Amino acid sequence: LSYTEDSDGQILEEGITESGSMASFIAAGTSYATRGVPMIPFYTFYSMFGFQRTGDLIWQAADIRARGFMMGATAGRTTLLGEGLQHQDGHSLVLASTVPTVQAFDPAFAYEVGAIVRAGIEQMYGPDSPESERDVIYYLTLYNENYPMPALPEDAALAEEFRSGAVRGMYRFAAAPEGPSRRATILFSGVAHSAARKAVEELAEHYDVGAELWSVTNYKRLREQAMATERYNRLHPSAKRETALVTSLLSESTGPITAVTDFMCAVPEQIGRYVPTGRPFKVLGTDGMGRSDTRESLRRHFEVDCGHVVVSTLEGLADLGEVDRSLVADAIARYDIDPDAVDPFLV
């Protein structure tokens, strides 16, 4: 690791010692209270060996009101190719969802990471942040797959919508292509954007379906906001009913909804009951053990590649009666999907 020493910063390269590293994170993350010296630790680690290996220490950090950033590097079940089941993380976001003060983000693009980090620092130490909301830990998944990073839109208002959407949990990344007569919605997180974006092209070209794309950076935050809305409505029966943010945003979209992630299906399913009524909600995730193979083979094995996104979207349209189920069978054949393959969860 190459770095430059500086009098106003510090880097600790601790090696394979997750418990020791968490101790350092806690010390730095609580120094605002114990020493009156605000610090903002960024702890970067193999995402598989964070919440799974040092969960007790992360809970302790939350309990004693630590502030800082945990960076789950080499994230995703299919992204760390060739490393096998001991290193391929498809569930740190599930474990992170159990810690109340952790905000668990799964960004896809560089501008999302930048917006999230800025928002986190402002929440922890910004002058306009309420005291009751300062004691938080931001967990960000970071992948090791290289791909071109899209720029923010040139329109300033739209660029701000992208940034604020990344922080609140989701935003519309791309409108449905013009031309197709049928409509659908695809949600992606992290590296799953590639399968989602390719599926949009395939659906438009071969199946007369225009799918809009939404980037979902934080299912946990969306769920918690929706739960707070439910609680308010329950305890204020005479007040005007409020609508959960995720329900309101998805109401702006059309058609069946497919969510694709490089993590377990349990991550997108956090918002399942808040999807607008009457909209089929399909989830593609990487439940099961990791295995050593290429990214392409792993994504086919876990059924989260482009072909499976297309099939899932068409199934949702068939559920609504908008297409015949023979079209689903056509897509299964087109993308050479084996319908009798063993469930990846069982392998």
What is the predicted function of each stretch?
Residues 14-32, 267, 309:
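Conserved phosphate/anionic-ligand binding catalytic regions in large, soluble enzymes, centered on
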Residues 4-22, 43-51, 71-75, 81, ...:
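Active-site nucleophile and cofactor-binding loops and adjacent substrate-binding regions
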Residues 1-15, 37-41, 179-182, 290-291:
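Glycine/charged-rich beta-loop-alpha catalytic/anionic-binding loops adjacent to active sites
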Residues 34, 74-87, 91, 97, ...:
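Thiamine diphosphate
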Residues 24-36, 59-65, 95-99, 271-274:
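Alpha-helix C-terminal capping segments
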Residues 59-77:
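A glycine-rich helix N-cap at a beta->alpha junction
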Residues 39, 65-69, 100-102, 255:
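Short glycine-/polar-rich loops that comprise or flank the Walker A/P-loop
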Residues 21-25, 41-45, 53-57, 61, ...:
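Extended, hydrophobic alpha-helical segments in both membrane/secreted and soluble proteins
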